Amino acid sequence: MNIDRKILNKALAKEKVANCQKDYTDIESKFARRTPENTVEDTCHLIPGVTESVANCHFNHSSKTFMVIHGWTVTGMYESWVPKLVAALYKREPDSNVIVVDWLRRAQHHYPESADYTKLVGEDVARFINWMEDEFKYSVDNVHLLGYSLGAHAAGVAGSRTNTKVSRITGLDPAGPNFEYAEATSRLSPDDAQFVDVLHTFTRGSPGRSIGIQKPVGHVDIYPNGGSFQPGCNIQDALRVISQKGFGDMDQLVKCSHERSIHLFIDSLLNEENPSKAYRCNSKEAFEKGLCLSCRKNRCNNVGYEINKVRAKRSSKMYLKTRSQMPYKVFHYQVKIYFSGTETTTYTNQAFEISLYGTVAESENIPFTLPEVSANNTYSFLIYTEVDIGELLMLKLKWITESYFSWSSWWGRPTFTIEKIRVKAGETQKKIVFCSREKVSKLQKGKEAPVFVKCHDKSLNKKSG
């Protein structure tokens, strides 16, 4: 019987690859199953090719598996966030397996070298997952990879090389340098798992130079606070921490925004009753104007663990505001105001304060700035509160003067007439219209804040998408 030589060679090559894959001695990455009782230390390693190691580490074959992949390290040691994330995962999923992928030796080289090593680390992780699937028939539908910085791209490489697609990859501020313009096969991409979600928290700088990658690389890409920088991470906060804790925490300050991605995910695990919401938007500028607080047709989503796994044809860029510390959730509002009057001057960069009063609490003197204000125009802007004030009942609006001895006090104060203020609450999707408590409210710069209450016409106030 004649056998086509090309077919035979192809079959032999395939068999050779299969046999090589069964030799796992060249895998350098380590896979430690940490426990709820010991989230800090790697006490038990699952070793590819050594079947008894899985039983020895008490691996739960019927539960979810989280694989945590760290990023670049200067010290060659795990960072302090690792046990925090492990503990939070176990608190949310007590019967799960949390495996920390140790690639510390490769991660402590100069950054470009460690960036190149992500391909080998990803290959190691993929071979481990394939072995678990082949040897134990473990369902890859139960596997969730969580990669931080360079670890996010290692997770992407792993996902692209598994025999069956893993359920989910979460990219925690995937690294930017060496990856912003890289091919999809060398970095995290939507093709690497059944669902890929990404948190971008430190994208400040030009593309390719920012610590975190700027472009969307998942099915859903979330940019908290615009993604460039995070509240609580500025120089004033740095000086405060140094005064309290000394210079020993300086490295944490440098990583503050980058690492915020991890803590936002931890927050979603610990505060499951109140998930933060992100909103789909074409740009952060449009989001800052409050134009994107819609939840219709999957336009809003939960942040972190309980995200709705929506796979669109192209990546969804989503935005939200957060607090500077955990819990990070805030409450978003779009405010629209029509400024009427006879003023002929256009005022630029004007500072205002708005106060919100609700059935549960109030949030007073929330500052905002309008780039320009002129008569007979409508302006939309975004504000947020750090507390849930309940259903809105009343507003106050104040136009702030630059100083007591400003030019306006000499030449007469600029004045606008405000009849109605329209507010949309992002979290509840309610639209409310507020009318002046007086017949007409005069908004004067530096003067007392006029009061607005819910309009009596019920048709003006409704729930909307």
Curated annotation (Swiss-Prot):
Q: Which residues form the PLAT domain?
A: 331-454
How does the entry describe its membrane topology?
Answer: Peripheral membrane protein
> Any signal peptide, and if so, which residues?
1-17
Name the cystine pairs: C44-C57, C233-C256, C281-C300, C292-C295, C435-C455
Query: Sorted alphabetically, which keywords does the UniProt record give?
Result: Calcium, Cell membrane, Chylomicron, Disulfide bond, Extracellular matrix, Glycoprotein, Heparin-binding, Hydrolase, Lipid degradation, Lipid metabolism, Membrane, Metal-binding, Nitration, Secreted, Signal, VLDL
What reaction does this enzyme carry out catalytically?
a triacylglycerol + H2O = a diacylglycerol + a fatty acid + H(+); a 1,2-diacyl-sn-glycero-3-phosphocholine + H2O = a 2-acyl-sn-glycero-3-phosphocholine + a fatty acid + H(+); 1,2,3-tri-(9Z-octadecenoyl)-glycerol + H2O = di-(9Z)-octadecenoylglycerol + (9Z)-octadecenoate + H(+); 1,2-di-(9Z-octadecenoyl)-sn-glycero-3-phosphocholine + H2O = (9Z-octadecenoyl)-sn-glycero-3-phosphocholine + (9Z)-octadecenoate + H(+)
The record's annotation in PROSITE patterns points to: LIPASE_SER (PS00120), PLAT (PS50095)
> Which residues are responsible for catalysis?
S149, D173, H258
The answer to whether the entry has keyword Lipid metabolism is yes
For this protein, the record's SMART domains field holds: LH2 (SM00308)
Q: Which residues cross the membrane?
A: none
Protein's cellular compartments:
Cell membrane; Secreted; Secreted, Extracellular space, Extracellular matrix
List the coiled-coil residues: none
Describe regulators of its activity: The apolipoprotein APOC2 acts as a coactivator of LPL activity. Ca(2+) binding promotes protein stability and formation of the active homodimer. Interaction with GPIHBP1 protects LPL against inactivation by ANGPTL4.
Q: Can you tell me which residues bind Ca(2+)?
A: A184, R187, S189, D192
Note down the stretches annotated as region Interaction with GPIHBP1.
433-457
Region feature (Important for interaction with lipoprotein particles) = 407-411
- Which cellular components does GO assign to this protein? chylomicron; extracellular space; plasma membrane; very-low-density lipoprotein particle
Which tissues is this chain's protein expressed in?
Answer: High level of expression in expression in adipocytes, heart muscle and mammary gland.
Q: Where is this region: Essential for determining substrate specificity?
A: 233-256
What are the EC numbers?
3.1.1.34, 3.1.1.32
Complex and partners: Homodimer. Interacts with GPIHBP1 with 1:1 stoichiometry. Interacts with APOC2; the interaction activates LPL activity in the presence of lipids. Interaction with heparan sulfate proteoglycans is required to protect LPL against loss of activity. Associates with lipoprotein particles in blood plasma. Interacts with LMF1 and SEL1L; interaction with SEL1L is required to prevent aggregation of newly synthesized LPL in the endoplasmic reticulum (ER), and for normal export of LPL from the ER to the extracellular space.
**What does this gene product do?**
Key enzyme in triglyceride metabolism. Catalyzes the hydrolysis of triglycerides from circulating chylomicrons and very low density lipoproteins (VLDL), and thereby plays an important role in lipid clearance from the blood stream, lipid utilization and storage. Although it has both phospholipase and triglyceride lipase activities it is primarily a triglyceride lipase with low but detectable phospholipase activity. Mediates margination of triglyceride-rich lipoprotein particles in capillaries.
The record, for NCBIfam families, names: lipo_lipase
Which family would the database say this protein is a member of?
Belongs to the AB hydrolase superfamily. Lipase family.
Q: What is this protein called?
A: Lipoprotein lipase
Gene, per the UniProt record: LPL
